[in-house]
C-alpha cells in the first residue's frame, strides 16, 4: 500500500512539473505569436486586451487526440442525436420564431427543416453551445505542434474579427476546437459567411437572427440546392 501511495504521489509530482514547464513554454509562445499578430494587422491594444488572459488548456489537447465522432458509424451517430423529444423541441422552436425563420428561408432559399435539423444536431437547438474559452482553445491548439498551422490561421482570423469589432470577444465561449454559436462556426466560417441579419452593428451567432441567416448563407454559398 505504501508503495502504491509513493508511486501515485511521484506521478502527481512529475505531472505538476511537466504542466509548469508547458505553461512557461506557452507564455513564450504567446510572445512570439504577438509578433505574428501585429504583422497581420492586429493592433497591440487589441492583442493585449484579448490574449493576456489566454491559458494553456491541457484538456483541449486530450480532446484533440481523441474525438468520439470519428469512432462512430453513421447509424450510431444519428441515433444518438435524434429522438421524438428533439423533434418536438424543433417544432416548438419553429412556432416561436415563425416570422423570422420564414423570412430567412425566403431570402436564402434554404429549407427551414434543414436549418433546424442542423441546429438540433450541432447544439441541441442552442441549449449547449460549449463553455470553453475559444481564444484559449485556439491558442492551445496553435501552440501544439500537431495542427499548429491550421489553428494559427483560425486564431488570426478571430483576432481580426475582434479588431474590426465584428464580434464581441466577451461572448467567445464554445467548443474545445474553437467553434462558436448555435451552428458551431469556426472563425474562418464566421469571416466568410456570418451575417449581421438584425443590423445592430455586430455579429452574434448566439442570437436567432444572425445565427439562422449565417447558417443559411453558408449553405447557399457552398452550393446547397433546395428540393
How would you describe each model-predicted region?
Residues 2-20:
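Classical Sec-dependent N-terminal signal peptides that target proteins to the secretory pathway
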Residues 6, 10, 27, 110, ...:
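Generic hydrophobic-segment detector
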Residues 19-30:
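Cleaved targeting-peptide boundary
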Residues 37:
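Intrinsically disordered, low-complexity polar regions and short flexible loop motifs
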